[in-house]
Design a protein with these regions (language model features):
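N-terminal Rossmann-like dinucleotide-binding module
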Residues: 1-54, 133-136, 227
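A structural signal for well-ordered alpha-helical segments within the folded catalytic domains
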Residues: 19, 87, 91, 114, ...
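Conserved SAM-binding strand-loop segment of SAM-dependent methyltransferases
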Residues: 59-64
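N-terminal Rossmann-like NAD(P) cofactor-binding module of classical short-chain dehydrogenase/reductase
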Residues: 76-78
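Beta-strand-loop-alpha-helix segment that lines the small-molecule cofactor/substrate pocket
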Residues: 82-83, 87-135, 149
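Basic phosphate/pyrophosphate-binding loop/patch that engages nucleotide-derived ligands
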Residues: 118-125, 141-156, 174-176
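Core domains of carbohydrate- and sulfate-ester-processing enzymes
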Residues: 158-202
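Rossmann-like dinucleotide-binding domain that binds NAD(P)(H)
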Residues: 183-262
Length: 262
């Protein structure tokens, strides 16, 4: 396959899960990574260096995703930005004629999800969201076995995940890395004061309301998706149960409530 026949790819947000997107595209002979988008200049250049060693061509590093969407060499985009950017990234990409793959969760809130669907239909572009669990051979086979009656009638599914994690620590006023374009990183979110309230800038946005969705939007999509997949459910829930308690780490909080929702 010649370079002209390959599908041109732009990966948006490459510090964490975006690195896995890069790895998968590099394994596929049909694709060529042509643009890397990240608001952290150091991260973008590091990824471009690694890609050049593996595919020969060095992608163009940019901090503004709109440059990738305007690039005729780009056919598709995948994005693994913080959650608050997911919907707008997909909508802008489809407006520019690109198909879009969005890392879970597909959006920061439900209204953004409906806007993505509307954009996909309006511009005639593909928009997909997924998790690595959907591509896991073991999980695929387990779900098929269960749905074929392998363990009898299933009436209840519980999504559980146990991981050894450090405390997210106390809220505070933490420094933003000098190589980060914070205005671009914040994008459609409201600016807060202090701007960064957790110590690990490139991960702790999960615990900041304007950018993430807590663990419900971080680990939650994996467990809820597998449960719904296994049960064959394709409708929205009609009831929600909440329960809580302060468990494990005693990070600083202004309230005394810890709530799980399911």
């Amino acid at each position: 396959m010649s370079a002209n026949d390959k599908i041109g790819v732009a990966v948006v947000g490459v510090n964490g899960r975006g690195g896995e997107h890069i790895s998968e595209f590099l394994r596929d002979d049909r694709t060529e990574i042509r643009v890397i988008v990240d608001v952290d200049e150091a991260v973008a250049n590091r990824r471009c260096d690694d890609i050049e060693k593996k595919q020969g061509l060095r992608p163009k590093p940019v901090s503004d995703m709109r440059q990738a969407f305007d690039d005729d060499a780009v056919d598709i985009i995948s994005t693994a930005t913080p959650n608050h950017w997911h919907a707008l990234t997909g909508i802008w990409a489809m407006q520019a004629g690109k198909d879009a793959y969005i890392e879970k969760p597909v959006c920061h809130n439900v209204l953004e999800g409906t806007a993505l669907i509307a954009a996909s239909r309006k511009y005639g572009r593909m928009c997909q969201v997924g998790t690595q669990c959907r591509s896991s051979k073991a999980i695929i086979e387990a779900v098929a076995f269960m749905r074929e009656g392998g363990i009898g009638e299933v009436k209840l599914a519980r999504g559980l995940c146990y991981k050894r994690r450090k405390s997210i620590g106390a809220r505070g006023d933490y420094a933003i890395p000098a190589t980060v374009n914070f205005d671009m990183w914040s994008g459609p979110a409201s600016l807060t004061d202090p701007r960064c309230t957790r110590p690990n800038f490139h991960y702790d946005w999960h615990w900041q309301r304007h950018y993430g969705n807590g663990d419900l939007g971080n680990q939650g999509p994996h467990q809820t998706d597998i449960a719904r997949w296994g049960l064959g459910i394709d409708t929205h829930p009609s009831r929600i149960l909440c329960y809580g308690g302060r468990l494990g780490y005693q990070a600083e909080r202004k309230d005394d409530k810890y709530v799980d929702a399911g």
